[in-house]
Each structure stands twice: as C-alpha cells, then as structure tokens.
Amino acid sequence: MAGEVREWVSSNGKKLEAEFISGTEKFVTLRRTSDGRRFTINLDKISDEDREWVKQKLEEVEGPGKKEPSGIFEDRLNDSWEKMEFGTLKFRFWGGKKLKNTKRYPVVVFLHGRGSGGSDNEKQLFSVPRKLSSKGFYKDNPSFLIAPQCPDDNKGWRGVYIKDVIKLVNESIKHLPVDKNRIYITGLSMGGFGTWEALSIAPELFAAAVPICGGANPSIAKKIKKVPIWTHHGEADEVVRVEWTRGIVNALEKAKGNIRYTEYPEDSGIKHDAWTPCYNNPEVFEWMFSQAKNK
C-alpha cells in the first residue's frame, strides 16, 4: 500500500507531490518528494478525490470487513420477498441467500403508484420489483431490494411516509453489508413524485434515481443537481401532465444538473404507462447500477 507517489490536492486547492505512507479513517501519512519530509494530516484537509483514493487503498488491504445482517434484517436473506414492517410502513424486502458478508451491495428502493397502497403488503410488488428479483437479472445485479407500501394513496409519498422510507434505507445501511455509494431509488406515477420528494429531502443519500411520470417543484433543482437522474414521461399522459416533468428537467438543465430525460412522443402510443418502456429498456438498469457516488 505504501510507496506510491502521486499528486495530492488540499481542500483549498493547493497541490503537493508526495509518497503515500499509510492511512486510517481520519488521517493520512505522506512523505513529500521535494525534501523527504514526512507528515500526517487530517483527511478533512485534502480533496474529496484524495479522500476516496485513501479509502480505496485501505479497503484493498483490509477489505470492507465482515458485516452480518442484524436488527430487523437478521435471518431475512432468503431469496424471497420477505414481509416486514418499519415505522408507519409495511414493506417487502429481498436479499439473496448467496450474498457474502465480506462484500458490499447496492440498495434499490421502489415506490409504487396510486392503487397499490394500503396494508396488504402485496400490491406494491407490481411492475419492477419482480423483474429486479428474477433469477437471471439478480445474478448479474445482486442487491438489497426494498418495496415499501404507502398506507394511504390519498396522502401519497409525502410527509411521514416518505421520511420513513428514508429512515428505512438508513436502517438497511446500519444492519446490512450495504455499499453506501450505490443506493438507488425509482418509482412510477405517485411513486415518481415520491422519488423526487425523497431526493429533495436527502439528496446526499442517493447515487441515482429513475422517476417515471411524476414531477416536482422546479425550486428543488439546485438542491438535487448533483444526483444522476434519468426521468421518463409520456407526452400524451392524461393522468399526470407531462409539464410536471418538463418543468423540473428544465430547471435542472439551467442549474447544470446531472439530468437525462426520455419523453415518449404522442404517436408512440405511450400515455401514462411510461414505466413499461422504461423498465423494459435494459439500458436504464445498466445506467442505474453503474452509478456510484465515489466515481
């Protein structure tokens, strides 16, 4: 691990060529090449890129360490959609039996649309959850899948319900071998609105988002502009007007956000059901799973 010479950048932009000697979670020890002086500095004093480099070097030597499922997730890695509860929510959880406690895996959150809410803990598995847990797909994209059910479709993914979704994701980070740099969220219709809402509350939590036929107040654009987002909407949508998505997309483009937009034209036959072409497009998932906050 030691012995590598590279250019380092301080948090205020100053550059230094130095040999990496060692590092910890809080400090890094370097030897300056110009005079051989050795010194230890706080990681807060170097750039984000350099901090991530140190972290990766430490993991190469030490590995991420074992992390057994615990808390509400103990004994829940069963290759099945486990029925669970957290806060105000009932939710389904999928974790593969073969996931290793020495590795870290992404989390995917799916927010359903209106009509799938309630308390049966069943209807929210409509659409993409079954695809993500299918044998072939899951083998190529192992992850922890979370599909919460909104207790009240009339209230939607707002207030305490979306806040509990965020708390649930943090609970998974605490008790599962989660890759904190690869937490994804997607949702359709009411869940599309919920996806935007989650981003506005905790933009630092997510590595990527795929909101479908939803929308958001353009005023949140600056807050969420660093999150990679690929949003979808049908031009002929008669349930949620396409202007809902166009507005936030335009605001993100003006804010120089990381935004990608697919609008299905009127002559495509796609109306509100923009999730079918979206989720049937393998490029969407290739893009989503390739996103990471430490890239």
Q: Language-model segments: what does each one mean?
A:
Residues 107, 111-166:
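Active-site machinery of serine-nucleophile hydrolases
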Residues 212, 228-232, 236-295:
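C-terminal catalytic histidine-bearing segment of alpha/beta-hydrolase fold enzymes
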Residues 60-107, 188, 198, 210, ...:
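A domain-start/cap signature at the N-terminus of enzymes
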Residues 98-103, 154-190:
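Gly/Ser-rich "nucleophile elbow"/oxyanion-hole loop immediately N-terminal to the catalytic nucleophile
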Residues 141, 224-229:
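Short, proline-enriched alpha-helix->beta-strand connector loops that line the catalytic pocket
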Residues 1-87, 141:
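Compositionally biased alpha-helical segments
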Residues 175, 181-225:
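Primarily recognizes the serine-hydrolase "nucleophile elbow" in alpha/beta-hydrolase
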Residues 103-104, 118-124, 157-160, 197-198, ...:
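Short, solvent-exposed loop/turn and secondary-structure capping segments
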